[in-house]
Amino acid sequence: MAWDTEGLVGPEGADWRVPVQELENRRARLSVALSENGIESALIDDPVELYWLTGGRQNGIILIGGKDSDVQTTHWVKRSLERAKFESGGDDCPDPVIAQPRMADLANSIREIGGTEKPATLEGKIPHNRWKFISSKIKSLVGESKDCTSIMYGLREMKSNWEIDMLRESGRINKEMFESIKEKGGLGKTELEMAAVADNVSRKAGFGGRIRMRKWPMDCDRVVIVAGESASIPSYFDSAIGGVGASPISPLGSGHAKVKSNSPVTVDIVHLHRGYVSDCTRIFSAGTLSRVWMERLDHMAEIQKAVVSSLSQGDDCSKAWEIGSFMAKEMGYSDNLMGMNPDKSHFLGHSVGLELDETPVIANGFNRPLCIGGTMAIEPKVIYPDGCIGTEDTFVRTEDGMECLTMGNSFPLFTDWD
């Protein structure tokens, strides 16, 4: 081999691989879930789900056998096989990691490791053409291929202790990004100038450059800074804040507007630590804000506290939405909560993990609680023609209630640069 796996390290030579025990537990959970749903096996090839199951994001597929099946779980890799072996634990890999067969031989390869039925696929996530291609290669197997997307999403809602540690570290770095903006932002600075300052902190800490989302065709700017009127400009993105963005091909978030005196600047930052999302929002200004703006901020903090309390008690996410949106209505914010008509968003929080837009969501229709181990960013905001104000932190639900994984009270809701 012409290269050395010793180069596959994090900062200061740290081993950033997912622990093998994590991979074993995840595969075991999926294996049980497949059998509970009458599925012999599942063929997984989406990059995020592959990472969750294999610890890497190489070009390949993994076949997970159901607990009650005779299928040998196998990770097939097209490129790079040696890297995939290392990232899955090297000699301690939970299951075989071997070269991917020709797709024309996929059905026979499945038979060789104990499969007889068409495996389930991520029909609800992968591109339709990819699904059609895989389906054409497994048509000689018996039965009908089922969609295992909801099974995978459901399993990933409940984070392990290791994953929660990753989110907590993500939150720590997120706070450092805010501290850099506190230090170097201010009057006359452009939104993009300040975003670059935060980006620098994130990159030095190991951010890989991608924010992954489920909902097509969503992509996002992870350092959204909107000064004054910029916050009222809508975008394609399903969020309270739009923003001008850098150009028409990037019409979201930080743009070329400059900070003005006594006007709210909303800073909404996403950081990923080893893939895991933390999401926070705080308000800045160059000079004092009016009493009206500060009252609005206090109200958003009250709404966030009520939503967190509801989730902590085990209320359905739809109930938490009802509580928060009713409070906003009583406070007089119906026309401004999470945007202005006709560009409003209708949620108060979203689950996070390896993706920014995981489930459940604080919105109508999510008639189930956030599970123990579930992680969620809760972000009440109000938008007006002259600006936005609100707050956001990322939480995990534990047996004892909701725990903040990000800045919480350690960084003020409002910072005056002057």
Regions found by a protein language model. Give the residues of each.
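Active-site neighborhoods and metal-handling regions in enzymes and metal-associated proteins
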Residues: 1-418
